[in-house]
Amino acid sequence: MANQNKHTHLIGFTFATIVLMCGVAAVTLNFEVVRDFLIGLNYRPTTEMSEIRDSLKLTTKGARIFNAVMPELMERTEFNNLCRESESETAILGCYREDRVYVYNIKDEELKGIRELTSAHELLHAVYHRMKPDDKNKLTELLNQVYTENKSTLGEEIDLYEDAQKLEELYVREGTEIKNLPEELENHYREIFEDQDKVVDYYESYITVFRKLEKTLKDLLIKIEVLEAQISVKTKEYEAGAETLNKDINEFNECAKTPNCFTSTWTFNNKRNALITRQAELGQVYEGINDLINDYNGYVAEYNENIIHGQALNMTINSSTKVENL
């Protein structure tokens, strides 16, 4: 009987152990979730950041991680102290460090969406750091496939990253800059954003400003170069014509001074009228050159205005730019 009771007890003990072990496993699996949830309870976003969070249409998981990394909008000096580690003048819009997110507080109305996009970008860094190696590996092929198809958008400089960093950057950039992703990737990002396309809209909203500006500058430069060539050709044509005309006028005047050089009044008048006609035609060439020069100067002025505008935008997004008092 004793043996039977002991056996029963062992069965009971074994069962209890199994239950306990399952409980430990469950806690282990959810520890990060619980930790993020608890940390997030202490998050007190500003009104602006709260609006940004709402605009991203985060899922429960996305909102939990967002709150846990406590994104903050930072002004220039404080942002540079936290996010800029060198004297590089490269524009840095945000950073994820020590499981916190910091976003450069860019308020330019022309660049609407840039803070939302940056917040989403840095959030995905936090998400990626929470992913298990196996989950990352499952996405590797898809991320590389999308990159191959979108190098013009994502930039070939990504190839300069080391493999691990490259995959993380692809994960973050593709999730915030590319629409119409493979279904498996879309489903993955849907765990964070209810509408990943909406996040990409924020990216396109501000990046379009720079792309339009770049296109405008290229178009203006083409017009400037074409006019420059036309002015050069027309100027040479005018100078050659003026040289020949002046020579012929001098010959005509010398002939007019010489008795019997012109055989008749008709010949005199005919040659004189021909010179006057040529002079008028050359004057039209001169006016045409002036018109080209006016157009050229107009395009140059417009080009310079756009350059200044572009520099101002770059200063706006670049926290390393030193603002000097005028």
Predicted regions mapped to residue ranges:
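Active-site recognition of the HExxH zinc-binding catalytic motif
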Residues: L117-R130
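Extended alpha-helical coiled-coil "stalk/arm" regions
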Residues: K234-N269
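Alpha-helical transmembrane signal-anchor/signal-peptide segments
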Residues: V34-E48
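Metalloprotease/metallohydrolase-associated module, dominated by Zn2+-dependent proteases
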Residues: A2, T14-L29, R44-E98, L139-A242
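N-terminal Lys/Arg-rich, disordered targeting/topogenic segments
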Residues: M1-T8
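C-terminal amphipathic alpha-helix
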Residues: R278-L326
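Short pre-active-site segment immediately N-terminal to the catalytic Zn-binding motif
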Residues: Y102-S119
